[in-house]
């Protein structure tokens, strides 16, 4: 496979492609769509596929990858596949079985990257969001350092090439980094990051500790009713961004993605639209001038499209801290 996607070296010696394809599909009818769009993404040169147990479409994504291996488009080693440990499996004894369950669904022998999806622990079981009779989430109390040790064992067993975290704040990263007997540092922290939430302080902390920041929601967001405030401004309609797009003769989405790559961030782009999937690959055809990067830095307004409010009552809720 001849992909023009550049890679960044991780702190464990493996490398991650700087542009990834996001596969989150909220509704049932989008599951099949996520399979088709993943095939298209691989066809046009995406080799980094980001998924999760939470998305409930790993079977479809696995089929897409397998079909592209079988038709000779790619080899397994060309693909960088990320999965994530959901909050109902934080207890150490549940970590490996959860990863093995994902691998079975995917029909893969290993994942390239396995992340703790969210630092808030939920009651174990088959329900993704277990609730009591009043509709409140049923939380669990787990020491994330114990969860991390179980993640390290998954790496040692060859089930995951690299391990990292997602949605962790600085304090939570510090807790892992300062853990007595730490065997492997997290290779990355995948967080919401875009022009309206540029995460500059968290990025600086991650760089200082040789942790790659991976951006989800890099293009703002589709409007998922259950998790975002519908009054939030549409990122890709931002006048400064649109003017910049005109200047570079690119789309606002390409400018938003290039902004992240120029900061040393790995960006995830999600689309079910073939034309846009193809277009996102053009991000490697240009660079932004440093003055324009400064202008884009100025768009930050600390705006979260995914505030995850339903987890606020848990002591590990990550977004109360400044970063």
From Swiss-Prot:
The record marks 54 as: Important for substrate specificity. Substrate binds at residue 117. Pfam families: Aldo_ket_red (PF00248). It comes from the Eukaryota. PROSITE patterns: ALDOKETO_REDUCTASE_2 (PS00062), ALDOKETO_REDUCTASE_3 (PS00063). NADP(+) binds at residues 20-24, 50, 166-167, 190, 216-221, 270-280. The record marks 84 as: Lowers pKa of active site Tyr. It catalyses: (17R,20S)-17,20-dihydroxypregn-4-en-3-one + NADP(+) = 17alpha-hydroxyprogesterone + NADPH + H(+); (17R,20S)-17,20-dihydroxypregn-4-en-3-one + NAD(+) = 17alpha-hydroxyprogesterone + NADH + H(+). Gene3D superfamilies: NADP-dependent oxidoreductase domain. Belongs to the aldo/keto reductase family. This is Aldo-keto reductase family 1 member C18. It comes from Mus musculus (Mouse).
């Amino acid at each position: 496979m001849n992909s023009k996607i550049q890679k960044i070296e991780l702190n464990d010696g493996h490398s991650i492609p700087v542009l990834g394809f996001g596969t989150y599909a909220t509704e049932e009818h989008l599951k099949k769509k996520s399979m088709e769009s993943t095939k298209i993404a691989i066809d046009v040169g995406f080799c980094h596929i980001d998924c999760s147990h939470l998305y409930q479409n790993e079977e479809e994504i696995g089929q897409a990858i397998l079909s592209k291996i079988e038709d000779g488009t790619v080899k397994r080693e060309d693909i960088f596949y990320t999965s994530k440990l959901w909050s109902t499996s934080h207890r150490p004894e549940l970590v490996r079985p959860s990863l093995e369950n994902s691998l079975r669904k995917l029909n893969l022998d290993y994942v390239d990257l396995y992340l703790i999806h969210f630092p808030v622990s939920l009651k174990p079981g088959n329900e993704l969001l277990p609730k009591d009779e009043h509709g409140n989430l049923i939380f669990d109390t787990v020491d994330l350092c114990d969860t991390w040790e179980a993640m390290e064992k998954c790496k040692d067993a060859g089930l995951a090439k690299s391990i990292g975290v997602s949605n962790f704040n600085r304090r939570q990263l510090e807790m892992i980094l300062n853990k007595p007997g730490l065997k492997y540092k997290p290779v990355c922290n995948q967080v919401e990051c875009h022009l309206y939430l540029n995460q500059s302080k968290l990025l600086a902390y991650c760089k200082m500790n040789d942790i790659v920041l991976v951006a989800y929601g890099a293009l703002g967001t589709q409007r998922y009713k259950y998790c975002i405030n519908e009054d939030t401004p549409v990122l890709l309609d931002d006048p400064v961004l649109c003017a910049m797009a005109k200047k570079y003769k690119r789309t606002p989405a390409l400018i938003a993605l290039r902004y992240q790559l120029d900061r040393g961030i790995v960006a995830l782009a999600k689309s079910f639209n073939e034309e846009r999937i193809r277009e996102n690959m053009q991000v490697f055809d240009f660079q932004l001038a440093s003055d324009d990067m400064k202008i884009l830095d100025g768009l930050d307004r600390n705006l979260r499209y995914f505030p995850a409010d339903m987890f606020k009552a848990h002591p590990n809720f990550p977004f109360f801290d400044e970063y």
